[in-house]
Amino acid sequence: EGINAEALGANRIELCSNLAVGGLSPSFNEVKEALKFLNIPVFVMVRPREWNFIYTKKEKELMIQEIRNLKNIKVEGIVIGSLNKKGEIDTEFMKEVVKIAKPMNITFHKAIDEVKDYNKAIEQLIEIGIDRVLTSGKKDKAEDAIGFLKTINRLYGNDITFVAAGNITKDNLDSLNNKLDFKEYHGKSIVGYLK
């Protein structure tokens, strides 16, 4: 699918497994294969399991090792997110992620849409040094959160890049872009249907 997406005009690939549950970490071999065949940047999902984004100490250790492995093979970026039991950014873990991962690009994924205080969370991510935030504006579909997405982009868009996500396809991309005017959009069918 990555090769087809590149051929159809994608300018970056987010590589993950098990998209049905929002995406999980792909195997290391899948990442190496993708890097062989793709000429566009590859961002790799670092998420060991589904359910929620509250990770155990052991899971965090595995995620850090995964990030080290990805950095060693020159992956362009990672997509990751971690929350604490209070519904806030797990700032200590995310600081460690930034320390280990840089200079790779770091996208905080849709775990952001589950935080209690969105503005506080964005401010924390900026302070920590996260490059991008993948968000549907706390809704299932980006098109249901136009006002919210425009507001956060106006407030914080100079300090962090917002990537609109949530049922964005080739069919609704132009309409959404006319309303949002974001720099980046994310969707499995954003350049067309790949299968």
How would you name each of these model-derived features?
Residues 38-51, 100-112, 156-165:
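Short beta-strand/loop segments at the ligand-binding rim of alpha/beta enzyme cores
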